[in-house]
Amino acid sequence: MPWIISVALLCTFSSSAICLPEPLTFQVLTVCNFGFFFVVLPGDHLKVCPQGSTCCSQEMEEKYTQQSKHDFRNAVTELSNHLQATFNSRYKKFDEFFKELLENSEKSLNDMFVRTYGRLYMQNSGLFKDLFDELKRYYVGGSVNLEETLNDFWARLLERMFQLVNPQYHFTDEYLECVSKDTEQLKPFGDVPRKLKLQVTRAFVAARTFAQGLAVARDVIARVSAVNPTPQGAQALLKMMYCPYCRGLVAVKPCYNYCFNVMRGCLANQGDLDTEWNNFIESMLMVAERLEGPFNIESVMDPIDVKISDAIMNMQENSMQVSQKVFHGCGQPKTLAQSRPARSVPESGFSARFRPYNPEERPTTAAGTSLDRLVTDVKEKLKQARKFWSSLPSNVCNDEKMSAGSVNEDNCWNGSNKSRVGRALRVILSKTKAGYHPPIKP
């Protein structure tokens, strides 16, 4: 009876040092709510937790070891998942925007050329489809040489145009090959091919690099945040998170500086990644700046139909001079055996002009934003991701589930007992060299 009275008083006035039955302890139940008690044992059997009086069996210590690793992984994953989701959503948004931009550009060109050139364009539409197919293939990572692709497009276009403006002649494949070889020297399309090649090449390289960079960031975060503590790290995590339970201190959380010290050790490899990670972030910001400036893929692709049409007009206007240069270099072609009336240039469908492209017009796609706004948003997220890995230990310990917090050091677990860590540890940590990872043992 005196024992029962003593226990009742203990439950009434102080439950902080009371042990629970093993199953309830593992589930972190409140002792006074259930009235269960566990006999305090000597801790000689414990391998990690303090070996004084304890209410943990060896089996419980092993269970807590697994639970502490689980909690650690969850804490890191919870923080990294947000950043990973940010990069993933921005990658999907940019990818959707870019692909739709290409689709819209191709459709705009097709609609314009059907209205203007009619049957002549439709008979040669495969040439333009091939160009856009190659641009799309490059973006998704295909082995495409953009300069060669554009050179080939203009050479093939010259072959088709040359036959249309000289319908009275018969041209063999060998003759047309001779014509296309001199495309750069003849400059039948004016300066449009040179300018467009420069604009398309640098814009597509920047766009693909940016999209791939966002995907790489997402994947790196997923891999690096999949932490697996070393045996020494697992012991430190157990000692920090669950050894106080073996003392009956189920409501006492680890001291912040103690938590920070352990996390720096357990996340040392992630911290070492920070320099390369920050370099990567800065490189992505540089690409973003280019996308906002002269490498803006939107300002290149939106007017591409007008630019190609202008090139065709230039060829039309200078067809006689171009033809004479070709005849001089490749020889005089044979006339058609059976004569037929030559169609005039206006009838051939090359006479239409289009309104000039206004660079101030920045249409949005179905993705819901222009490239400028999309890149601005990504830049902000990139800046926020700086020093993510080196900040991970402090961010983990800032979680109220992981530590008592930096302002509550009078009532926290320091690795051996409930006490204040004190100013000494803070001084030591503040003087720690940047390249040194403190030991994960307290």
Spans of features found by a protein language model:
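Eukaryotic terminal intrinsically disordered regions
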Residues: 2-69, 76, 275-442
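N-terminal ectodomain recognition module in secreted, GPI-anchored, and membrane glycoproteins
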Residues: 2-3, 14-249, 253-256, 262-291, ...
